[in-house]
Curated annotation (Swiss-Prot):
Function: Plays a role in processing non linear or branched viral DNA intermediates in order to promote the production of mature packaged unit-length linear progeny viral DNA molecules. Exhibits endonuclease and exonuclease activities and accepts both double-stranded and single-stranded DNA as substrate. Exonuclease digestion of DNA is in the 5'-> 3' direction and the products are 5'-monophosphate nucleosides. Additionally, forms a recombinase with the major DNA-binding protein, which displays strand exchange activity.
Primary location group: host cell
Top EC class for this record: hydrolase
Family matches, as Gene3D superfamilies: 3.90.320.10
Source superkingdom: Viruses
Stated name of the protein: Alkaline nuclease
Matching HAMAP family: HSV_AN (MF_04009)
Similarity remark: Belongs to the herpesviridae alkaline nuclease family.
Lineage: Viruses, Duplodnaviria, Heunggongvirae, Peploviricota, Herviviricetes
InterPro entries in UniProt: Herpes_alk_exo, PDDEXK-like_dom_sf, Restrct_endonuc-II-like, Viral_alk_exo
Enzyme Commission number, as recorded: 3.1.-.-
Subunit note: Interacts with major DNA-binding protein; this interaction increases the nuclease processivity of the alkaline exonuclease.
SUPFAM superfamilies named among the record's database cross-references: Restriction endonuclease-like
Amino acid sequence: MDSSPVTYSGEPPYKLRRLSPSYPYVSKLRERCASKIETLSEGSARDSLEEEDVSEAMATGAFLATRLYLPSVLPQRITTLTFLDHFKKSRPLPNSDKRLNPIFYRLAYIRDLVGEMELEGIVERGTASRLLGASSPAGFVAGTYTHARDLSKTMSLASVRDAVLAIEAQTRDQSESQLWALLRRGLATASTMKWGALGPQYHPQWCEVSTNAKGIPNNPALQFGQTNERTARSLISALYVARSEAATPDLLVDPGCGQCFVFDESASVPGDAYACGLLMDARTGVVGASLDMLVCDRDPSGVLSPHSTQTTLDFFEIKCRAKYLFDPDLFSPVATAYANLLKHRTAVCLRKFLRSIKNPAVEYFAPTSVPGATEALITCNSSWKPREVNETNRRCGDFDRDHIALNLDASSDVWLFSEPDLESETITPARWDTGELALSVPVFANPRHPNFKQILVQAYVLSGHFPDHQLRPFLVTFIGRHRKRCEEGKTFTICDRPEGSPYNLNEVVHSSCAIPILLFVTPVIVDREGCWEDIEIESLTAFNKTADAIWDSDSPADVSEPTSS
């Protein structure tokens, strides 16, 4: 495992920063494009536009008529069209042929699904064939069944990747998107995989389990996470993600008007520029993952497209801990510990605050032992040892033990936030007693916890799309409190330092969100050399077993020419 520091070639458009100056920016390009669109709509002025102006507008996504669109809200009939039902209509290949890569069965399903949307009139005609890279998109014909064998003969690796990335761009609303929920059914995820002593394993009925899985539970803890995830994303953006001082040529509008970048303004709410949709494994089409936050450029169509100078992709999995939620106006152990933490701002007070509840978010385990699987953050540092420690004889397999060793020396950044400034309506990080804004603590991600497995699968899926980029995953833990009466209904802008001005006016704590108290940012190290191949092989094996079970109970191989539009 290569744990050497990451280096950049050239000046990347993004970088993770800590305590570096904030770079204010201006985004006037879209205003210029909008004015050009108005001019283009007037026939008398069309001929007066210079050719370079038209080219610039097209290059920046001004002509949105050609942009792919798939709806998030679907008719009831469409929501019942699952991958498994579509796959059950497929036929095995003749014995003389090799097995197809499962990705083509997945794309065949997506083509027919989008085709049904065409028939419903909720997407433009030709969208289904255009999504899969057809040079001359044709309208979908009712009754068509697309065969994977057809696609395997016509689609290149590049067109497969383009189709999968286009789907990601159309499902960035995640749980608020019915399309996202439908496409996840029949995909293996970290939660549907089983993890044995040697790594990932599949349930024999993995596809059925995924297809019939219930929706996301509507309990208070998950509601808290869904509400406050965008606050955590805004905090990460304000505290860590900085634009480079050097403007990159393809993002620069006019050297004479300063550094004007095209920022992704297509997200549903401000601060969600780095939100991701459903990414399917480009290697097999069996595994899916939805990242909470990926620092990466997007092209004018909204598709992920890292800049040529960006060699590293940073992504963040966000967890909001509802169990620390408290009312600051009520006397309680948590409120008292928080008041002391805000007053003294020491590592000792931090530990006391974390232990002010029954099951702290950071678990201590002895260096000669192994951690449990309950908490996502762990430590074996003696300074974090509680007065009473329950001795256990836990065991874990080589897979988890190896990852514990890889992450043992990692440390977390901990950010403490001051009380909101009601006059300026801002929230800023508070300096610790050491003078630092980010306190480094010997706390690392727990390989035995489901969050770690989730990040591992996300890294695997992302690496299939961007194999030449080094991945840097982080686990983000957000802790917030209830609002005081004087804070209710207010939206607070996030500053990156006490004496600084807001880095981005879109990075805010919305009125419906909790007031931030603490933010843990924990690097996650995965053994990609030992994991990627295992996941790929297990995925292919699981799919083939599912296919054999379906085909063995059905009719013999269809050796005739497939029927496809």
